[in-house]
Amino acid sequence: MTDPSNLFDTAMEALGNGDIDGLDLLRKSAEMGNAYAQNNYAMILYSGDLVDKDPESAFGWFRSAAEGGIDESQFHLGLEYYEGNMVDRDYREALKWFRVAAEQGYPAAQYYLGLCYYHGNGVFRDYGFAVRWFTLASDRGYSPATIALADAYMDLKNPDRNYKEAFRLYRNASEAGDERGYYKLGNCYYKGKGTPRNFIEASKCYRKGMEISKDTDCQYMLGIMYIKGEGVPKNHKIGISMVRDAAKEGNEEAKAYLMRLAGQNIIDIEDPAELMLEDTNTPDIIGGVKGAGGNKGIFSFLRRR
């Protein structure tokens, strides 16, 4: 009888050499119970690399691999329960799987476990535990956790709030190239939180965030600064244009700002439908699952034994 571990190794070697037949070997190894194969096959189905996307089948393989102790699958299983995509939302079940993966040192799971404690999802709210898990993930270089940790230190409801520490963390995240880090750092300079108010530095941060990822929050804030002449030469035309562009990309603050100006007959609205505000309660602290197994190219995220 073929050993599933050897079959897995053969499959990974084949896939690494660009041989699509390795996918069949990987599936066979998964069906024989190899947890690493189950995880990798789930990731392929989840991402849509090599095959059509099949989230439902991926969920089943994530569960099998999670029960086999694979931290990546434990995280993804928890994420499905947290977001309620393939199954009904169940924060307690999400918390269970995040904790198992987090205790194995998986940064994205540590981050989401911190979110559960921060927002009280599936557990009593506890800022101390949230900060602990954010810190562990941040120390492993997971930038969303660095941002979340800084957000926690900025939170007025947090008894241990620390603006200077938040500023330091935002700066670290931005220096690591995180676009949200530049936006948050810009806000610190703009509002004078954790550092003296400095409109010039704020404008630099917002501009950098735009250059990296076309961040619409940065675009909106830089537009406001042009309108007011804060840190940049006052230019109403450029400012309104930037705010309009941010609104067209769905930025809610930009939409609301333009609606206020239109209500005061300061500007005309070209397409009122574009400024329809969305009903969203998504907390600002929640970010994407950066580096947690997204579609980055098939060979960059498959696990080996």
Residue spans of the language-model regions?
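Terminal, low-structured helical/coil segments at or just beyond the last alpha-helical repeat
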Residues: 252-305
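Hydrophobic face of amphipathic alpha-helices that form TPR/SEL1-like repeat modules
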Residues: 7-14, 40-47, 76-83, 112-119, ...
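TPR/TPR-like (Sel1-like) alpha-helical repeat modules
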Residues: 234-252, 259-263
